[in-house]
């Protein structure tokens, strides 16, 4: 696909995106599941809307309807759970106590990562990524229905209704769009992937111009998003079949922006990252896919098992390929004490003697591994992550992660002056090659942590700004698309405060404007935050300098005083 047509496609489909972004944020965690407690699926606080009273009313109805479904399902859950708990409590209590004692008294620091053959990874992709889904109805909101796993491995997910409407029938797709999709699917099954990709791009243009549903003026944004997301995923599979993962990447990101709740969208993104050898990001996408499958009520253990296998393989590959650092996971069952962290570091130093210049133990958030991840048990088995570096400079920035809310990682000695081109190139190299790979690895086993809700995304947006300064437009667009996909997913992974929700909305809006090439008198949110971080760093440096100077001055005074006393005594 040439660059002109690609830009045209991006422009035409953005109208669909803009209608969807704010409602998606406002209805965070809108799915319900029979294995969740009522408190864990409470919706996040509302976000201020710019689209008028009608949208606000629709959002309120959405929340009420979702809440009623959750309450009904969770009442049924409590009855079943009490019976199960009574039956299994006696059997489990002995084992659980023994496990906790073992983890408290003995630090079990070796978690085996057996090698997973490439054939097994490809089998997972064939069953879950390259599924030929002709029907887009699986992405429409459907109440209390979960289709079983079919012979092809296709499964449907359920979501509570996103808007107050009659759900007895699914929306009718526009007939011309339906014809285009059937023709494209036919070419795909005939292995004419290039032709199929062209027809799916045509279908995407039809969809973005309003030809998505039979009654366009009565269409809901969620329904249009479902169809657009489906087409984006088909483009992903076409480009993967053509062995062009670089072309598939942006489509994978957009499918998540349009429908972050569908687990296959995340798994397809993981497959693209794998083909690009970005294994840490592939591992995180697979982890989110497994969580979304469970969150949406997926009950097929065979599907979850395949996703976890894929997730495990990506972590293994990321660890194997890491050269700058080594890693150790330590299981724990109770609150970690400072003396336990010191013991972990001692064990790490004995186990990895060449990676001891800088040792960082992440105490900020929960880490999970695919071998023991069970989302229905909250919290699942937790792990401490310890990273060791050959070069102290590579891991130095991690100290800021644990001590500051929104740290900046670029050493900008003059925070009130603009960056020169040389500084920009140097910072881009630092962020792109040293900081982001480590943060991506940390997040490959961390669904959510005690960091800020947008942690991990902010760094990518800062990186996009550096790319923009160097006029690397294509790379900038990819990074922003990826950041938008992560922002769209955040409300499903953790509860966010009102302040965080407003920040999320501002980041998403600015990211969209940047992609569209819109200029604004105001600075982008992430650049403003970066400036605040630089000023904070500058103040910290001034404070450190002042305290050091004060300490030296005090020491000199004491020394002078001692000399005077000695002189007096001698005289």
UniProtKB/Swiss-Prot annotation:
Bias type Polar residues, positions: 30-42
Coiled-coil segments: none
GO cellular component terms, A-Z: acrosomal vesicle; Golgi apparatus
Disruption-associated phenotype: Male mice are infertile with spermiogenic arrest and impaired differentiation of round spermatids into the mature spermatozoa.
Subcellular location: Golgi apparatus; Cytoplasmic vesicle, Secretory vesicle, Acrosome
Keyword Ribosomal protein assigned: no
Membrane-spanning intervals of the chain: none
Keywords of the record: Cytoplasmic vesicle, Developmental protein, Differentiation, Golgi apparatus, Spermatogenesis
Principal location: Golgi
Region of interest: Disordered: 30-58
Expression across tissues: Testis-specific. Expressed in spermatocytes and round and elongated spermatids in the seminiferous tubules.
Gene3D superfamilies: Tetratricopeptide repeat domain
Record-level GO BP terms: spermatid development; spermatogenesis
Family matches, as InterPro entries: SPATA16, TPR-like_helical_dom_sf
Pfam families reported for this sequence: NYD-SP12_N
PANTHER family: SPERMATOGENESIS-ASSOCIATED PROTEIN 16
Family that this chain belongs to: Belongs to the SPATA16 family.
Function: Essential for spermiogenesis and male fertility. Involved in the formation of acrosome during spermatogenesis.
Protein name (database record): Spermatogenesis-associated protein 16
């Amino acid at each position: 696909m040439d660059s002109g047509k690609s830009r045209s496609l991006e422009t035409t489909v953005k109208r669909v995106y803009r209608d969807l972004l704010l409602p998606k944020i406002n209805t965070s965690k809108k799915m319900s599941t029979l294995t969740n407690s009522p408190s864990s699926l409470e919706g996040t606080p509302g976000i201020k809307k710019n689209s008028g009273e009608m949208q606000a009313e629709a959002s309120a109805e959405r929340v009420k309807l979702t809440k009623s479904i959750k309450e009904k399902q969770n009442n049924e859950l409590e009855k079943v759970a009490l019976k199960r708990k009574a039956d299994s409590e006696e059997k489990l209590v002995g084992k659980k106590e023994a496990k906790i004692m073992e983890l408290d008294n003995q630090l079990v620091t070796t978690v085996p990562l057996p090698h997973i053959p490439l054939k097994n990874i490809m089998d997972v992709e064939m069953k879950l990524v390259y599924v030929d889904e002709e029907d887009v109805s699986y992405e429409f909101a459907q109440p209390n229905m979960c289709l079983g796993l079919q012979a092809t491995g296709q499964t449907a997910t359920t979501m509570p209704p996103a808007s107050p409407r009659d759900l007895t029938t699914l929306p009718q797709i526009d007939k011309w769009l339906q014809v285009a999709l059937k023709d494209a699917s036919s070419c795909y099954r005939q292995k004419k992937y290039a032709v199929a990709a062209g027809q799916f791009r045509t279908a995407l243009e039809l969809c973005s111009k309003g030809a998505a549903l039979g009654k366009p003026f009565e269409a809901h944004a969620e329904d249009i998003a479902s169809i657009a997301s489906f087409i984006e995923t088909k483009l992903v599979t076409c480009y993967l079949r053509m062995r062009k993962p670089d072309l598939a990447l942006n489509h994978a990101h957009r499918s998540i922006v349009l429908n972050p709740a569908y687990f296959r969208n995340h798994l397809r993104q993981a497959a693209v990252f794998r083909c690009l050898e970005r294994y840490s990001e592939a591992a995180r996408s697979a982890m989110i896919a497994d969580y979304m499958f469970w969150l949406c009520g997926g009950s097929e253990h065979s599907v979850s098992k395949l996703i976890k296998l894929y997730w495990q393989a990506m972590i293994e590959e990321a660890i194997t390929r890491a050269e700058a650092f080594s890693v150790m996971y330590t299981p724990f069952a109770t609150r970690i004490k400072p003396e336990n962290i010191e013991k972990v570091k001692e064990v790490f130093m004995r186990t990895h003697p060449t990676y001891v210049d800088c040792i960082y133990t992440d105490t900020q958030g929960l880490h999970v591994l695919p071998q023991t991840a069970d989302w229905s048990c909250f919290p699942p088995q937790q792990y401490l992550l310890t990273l060791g570096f050959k070069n102290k400079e590579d891991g130095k920035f991690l100290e800021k992660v644990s001590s500051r809310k929104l740290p900046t990682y670029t050493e900008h000695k003059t925070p009130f002056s603009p960056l020169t081109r040389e500084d920009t190139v140097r910072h881009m190299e630092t962020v792109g090659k040293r900081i982001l790979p480590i943060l991506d690895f940390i997040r490959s086993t961390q669904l959510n942590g005690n960091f800020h809700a947008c942690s991990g995304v902010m760094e990518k947006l800062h990186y996009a700004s550096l790319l923009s300064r160097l006029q690397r437009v294509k790379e900038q667009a990819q990074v922003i698309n990826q950041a938008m996909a992560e922002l769209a997913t955040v409300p499903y992974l953790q509860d966010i405060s009102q302040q965080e929700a407003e920040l999320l909305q501002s980041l998403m809006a600015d990211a969209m404007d940047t992609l569209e090439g819109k200029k604004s008198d105001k600075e982008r949110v992430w650049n403003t935050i970066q400036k605040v971080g630089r000023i904070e760093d500058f103040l910290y440096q001034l404070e450190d300098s002042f305290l050091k100077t004060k300490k030296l001055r005090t020491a000199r005074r004491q020394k002078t005083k001692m000399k005077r006393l000695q002189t007096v005594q001698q005289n």
